[in-house]
Amino acid sequence: MSIYTNSKPWTVPALAEAKRNGSKIVMLTAYDAGFARILDANGVDLVLVGDSLGMVVQGHDSTLPVSVHDMVYHTACVARGVRQAMLVVDLPFQADASPERALEAATPLLRVGAQMIKIEGAGHKLEVISYLVEREIPVCSHLGLTPQSVLRFGGYKVQGRGEEAGGRLRAEARAAVEAGATLLLLECVPSQLAAQITTDVSVPTIGIGAGAGCDGQVLVLHDLLGLDSGHPRPKFVKDFLAHGGSVAGAVRAYANAVRDGSFPDVEHTYTS
C-alpha cells in the first residue's frame, strides 16, 4: 500500500487519484481557524466542518439544533485556516429537505469557502444529490449511521448488520454514486460490509467506525484529542493525545496511522 503525499491543494480529481492508487485519505473535523491550521499543516487531506459542532462545541445532545447560520459561521472560520486540505461541510438537519432548499443552504457555505457539501441519508436525498451535482457542486453522501436520523434509529446504533440490512446499504451506496456523489462517508458499519461497499463503488469511501477497508478515515477532532464532550465515547474513537505531546503531534500520529493501516484496528471496529 502506497502512502499518498500531496504538496498541492486537494481537489475532486485528487480524490479519484487516491482511490486509483490505493492511497489512504485522512480526514478530521475542525470548527475554527486555529485548529484548521494545525490540521492543514500536519497531514490532513480533508477537513470536515461537521454539524457535530452542535454536540462538541455548542453542548447539545444531538446535531439537530444546528442551523445553516451556524454552519456558515464555522465554515468561514475554518476556511481562513486551510490552504492545502479540501473543505467539506455538512448541510444541517432539514436543510436538504428538498433540492431547492439544499441549494439555498449550500450557496452561502460555498461562498465562504466550502468545496464539497455533505448530505446524510439516501432515499429522497438521491434527488438532492443529483440536483446539486447538476449545478457543479461536489457532494459527499453520508450513509450508515446518520446522526440527523437519531430519533428514527432510537439512538446511535451500528447500521447494516444482517444480510437484508447490509444489502440495502450496498444498494444505497451504489445509488448515491449513480446520483453523482464524489465521496461516500460510512459511519458505524460492520467492517466487512464497508470493505464490500468500497470495492463496489468507483469513488472513495471514508470510514468512521467502519473498519480499515475503507479508502480513508475520519474522526471528530475533540474525540481524537480525548476531550470530554459530555457524551459516551464511541468504540471507534482512539485518543491520540492519551500519552501526552502536542495537538499537532496527535494529528500527525493519526494521519500516519491511517496511512500505514494501523488505525482503525480490531479494537475500534464493528463486526457483522
UniProtKB/Swiss-Prot annotation:
Its cofactor is Mg(2+). Pathway: Cofactor biosynthesis; (R)-pantothenate biosynthesis; (R)-pantoate from 3-methyl-2-oxobutanoate: step 1/2. Binds 1 Mg(2+) ion per subunit. The gene is panB. It comes from Xylella fastidiosa (strain 9a5c). One of its GO terms (biological process) is pantothenate biosynthetic process. Keywords: Cytoplasm, Magnesium, Metal-binding, Pantothenate biosynthesis, Transferase. The active site is at E187. GO terms for molecular function: 3-methyl-2-oxobutanoate hydroxymethyltransferase activity; magnesium ion binding. SUPFAM superfamilies: Phosphoenolpyruvate/pyruvate domain. This is 3-methyl-2-oxobutanoate hydroxymethyltransferase. 3-methyl-2-oxobutanoate binds at D51, S52, D90, K118. Transmembrane segments: none annotated. Belongs to the PanB family.
